[in-house]
Amino acid sequence: SHDVGFGERLKTAMAECRAVMEPFIKSRYDGALDVTIEEICDRMNTVRNGIAHSRLDLNLEAVHLSDLKIIEELLYAMRLQHLRVDTKSIQIGIKRLFGERISIE
């Protein structure tokens, strides 16, 4: 997977953890889930490339902080899913760990 870019790997991870991440994404962003995920991945890929290539004109905006929080939560979701923890338990864990004020159905 050396020739697969960060943005594509991020999209794959989001797809694999979609069920876990859905309530956290929906609590932060308006719009269709698929579109939102695509936008998060595109923005994070742009930021990553800007940092990797020392772009001094990189603009960080408030939405990037939300994106980074989602990525942080995604990392936990990926690890716990790999350990075969069930979706609801992962969501409850992320909610508690990150102090998310959302209800888990």
Predicted regions and their residues:
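Amphipathic, oligomerization/interface secondary-structure segments
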Residues: S1-E105
